[in-house]
Design a protein with these regions (language model features):
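HotDog/MaoC-like acyl-thioester-processing domains
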Residues: 1-23, 125-190
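Hot-dog-fold acyl-thioester-processing enzymes
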Residues: 2-128
Length: 190
C-alpha cells in the first residue's frame, strides 16, 4: 500500500517560475585587486591573468580573469552601504548568513522573491550548481546580474513526505551586454 500525501506545490509557488529579481549593477569593476583576492582564494595562478605578453599571444588576445569572478564581484558592497550581516549577527551570533537566515545574503540586492512555503517547510539544502561559461571577463568590465526561477518541482522523499526542488539561474553580463556566464542553482526545501 502506498501512502497518500497532500501536495505542497501550490498554484502560488508554480506562479513563481519565470519571476526575476531586479537587474543589478555590481559595485566596482573587474580590477587587479578583485583578481588578486579571487585567485588567492580559489587558488588559481594562471599566468593569463597577469603576464601581458603571454596573454596577448593566447586565444584571448589579452589579459583575462577567472570565468567565475563575476559571482564574487556581485557580493561586494560600496563602503557607503550598510552590511546587513551586522544586524543579523546582533540578533543571532550563531547565524551562518545563509539564505534562510532572515538576513545575510537574503538581503543582497537582486535576490529572488521568497517562495510562499508552507509553515512546516523549514529546512534548506543547497543541492548544487551548474555553470555555463560564455566568455571570460576582462579587466575593467562592469558586471551586471539578474536571477530568475526556472522551475519548482515537488518530489517525495524516502520517508514518504513531500519536498520541493527549486531551480534558479543567475546571468552575468559585462558593460557591453555580452553574457559572461550563467549559474544554475538547485535549492531543496523540506
Amino acid at each position: 500500500m502506498t501512502q497518500k500525501t497532500n501536495s505542497i506545490l501550490t498554484p502560488d509557488m508554480k506562479a513563481m517560475v519565470g519571476k526575476t529579481g531586479e537587474k543589478v549593477d555590481a559595485w566596482g569593476v573587474v580590477d587587479e585587486e578583485y583578481l588578486r583576492r579571487f585567485a588567492q582564494a580559489i587558488p588559481d595562478w594562471d599566468p593569463l591573468y597577469w603576464d601581458k605578453d603571454l596573454a596577448q599571444k593566447s586565444k584571448f588576445k589579452g589579459l583575462t580573469v577567472p570565468p567565475l569572478l563575476p559571482t564574487y564581484i556581485v557580493t561586494r558592497r560600496a563602503l557607503s552601504e550598510k552590511d546587513q550581516m551586522d544586524e543579523v549577527m546582533v540578533q543571532d551570533p550563531m547565524n551562518d548568513g545563509g539564505m534562510n537566515s532572515g538576513g545575510g545574503t537574503r538581503s543582497q540586492k537582486g535576490m529572488l522573491p521568497r517562495l510562499p512555503l508552507p509553515p512546516h517547510i523549514k529546512r534548506h539544502l543547497h543541492g548544487g550548481d551548474d555553470v555555463e561559461v560564455h566568455q571570460y571577463p576582462r579587466m575593467g568590465d562592469k558586471i551586471t546580474f539578474q536571477r530568475k526561477y526556472t522551475s519548482i518541482q515537488e518530489r517525495i522523499g524516502g520517508d514518504g513526505k513531500p519536498f520541493l526542488v527549486a531551480r534558479s539561474e543567475t546571468t552575468y553580463w559585462n558593460q557591453k551586454g555580452e553574457v559572461l556566464c550563467k549559474v544554475g542553482t538547485i535549492d531543496i526545501r523540506r
